[in-house]
Amino acid sequence: MARKIISYNPLKQKRPSILGKKTKRVSDISSKVTQKVIFELNDSLDRLITKYGILNGIGLAAPQINSNLRIAVIQLPKKRVVMINPKVIKKSKDSAVSAICCFSVQRYCGNIEHPKRIKIFYLDEKGKKRTYSVPKKNSV
């Protein structure tokens, strides 16, 4: 079942503490807690895709559903990626500016400067080591 996505209006409210805390590294991918968070992130992402019709580049991180685990789920053009313990291992020095919207900050879309290219190391939901490179303005 999809969890409610934590959101707030920065003009009226303080940021919920879970959104500013450092996440905890996942040590047991097969644990019930980890699997539940992965399921709920996927379910919540499905709900957002249905509601907004966005299919590419939309994603959620565990703190957005009130979990402090280091997990993110991202919808790419042809597949969905579950990233456990993701870490940026390389980023370009050149940058780009893109319009970004955040589901946790109500009504916030803005131009954000970010590296043009990044490389992320992560574990997939089966524990396999993976890397993913974002070559264009779609940097996460």
What feature does the model see in each segment?
Residues 1-140:
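Positively charged
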